Design a protein with these regions (language model features):
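Conserved glycine-rich cofactor-binding loop
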Residues: 13-14
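Substrate-binding pocket helix/loop in short-chain dehydrogenase/reductase
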Residues: 96-97, 101-109, 191, 202
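Conserved small/polar residues in nucleotide/adenosyl-binding loops
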Residues: 213-215
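Alpha-helical segment proximal to the catalytic Tyr-Lys
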Residues: 125, 169-173
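Active-site helix of classical SDR
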Residues: 120, 156, 164
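Residue(s) in the substrate-gating loop at a strand-loop-helix junction
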Residues: 140
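Conserved glycine-rich Rossmann-like NAD(P)H-binding loop of the short-chain dehydrogenase/reductase
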Residues: 27-44
Length: 215
């Protein structure tokens, strides 16, 4: 289905990003999955090899302009231009606003929102040139509903929604689609680290009171 397509997935070492990378790889795509460390990138490459998926893991700090530029340049030299970008990389640093430190705010905005701008812009020219491309960003229901103790995370995820709608209007006529996916509460390594009261608050908003899926 995705033969000859090149996919770039940020934050592919675990959780949602890993599941996306493996699913697209199983569908025939060549997949580049990023990790924040060399060891993480090596682990991605090993998983791809074990699963007989074409592609590799590569180290990337999504907040670093130079690293983003170099990554896309190296991918272009080794594999060609990216057909599908999945902006998945994200972190949490939860705190109530009165106790939130400035670095807790800035780290979330830089990693979860500003990286979307950096990554999307870096691959967009190649997509427009081919008049074909897909940019998919992982946001969250928290971006629409809010959640106490997550003003930073909610602001970043809401920003992704606005960014996505605006960019879609810019490049749709050029053959590039831009969409966002807002998962509910999914059990991953990241959500496992949430305080129990936040898990219960999120679960209370789900009709069955359960997470939708465990990854």
């Amino acid at each position: 289905m995705l033969d000859e397509k090149l996919v770039l997935v940020t934050g592919a070492t675990r959780g949602i990003g890993k599941a996306i990378a493996l699913t697209l790889g199983a569908a025939g795509a060549t997949v580049i999955g990023t990790a924040t460390s060399e060891l993480g990138a090596e682990n991605i490459s090993k998983v791809f090899t074990d699963k007989k998926i074409s592609g590799k893991g590569m180290k990337l700090d999504v907040t670093d302009n130079e690293q983003v530029s170099n990554l896309v340049k190296n991918i272009g030299e080794d594999f060609g231009s990216v057909d599908i970008l999945v902006n998945n990389a994200g972190i949490t640093k939860d705190n109530i606003l009165l106790r939130m430190k400035e670095d807790e705010w800035e780290d979330i905005i830089n990693t979860n929102l500003s990286s979307i701008y950096k990554m999307s812009k870096s691959v967009l020219r190649g997509m427009i040139k081919k008049r074909s491309g897909r940019i998919i960003s992982i946001t969250s229901v928290v971006g629409a509903m809010g959640n106490a103790g997550q003003t930073n995370y909610a602001a970043a995820k809401a920003g992704i929604i606005g960014f996505t709608k605006s960019l879609a209007r810019e490049v749709g006529v050029r053959g590039v689609t831009v969409n966002a996916i807002a998962p509910g509460f999914i059990e991953t390594d990241m959500t496992d680290s949430l305080p129990q009261d936040q898990k219960e608050a999120l679960a209370s908003q789900i009709p069955m009171g359960l997470s939708l899926i465990h990854i």
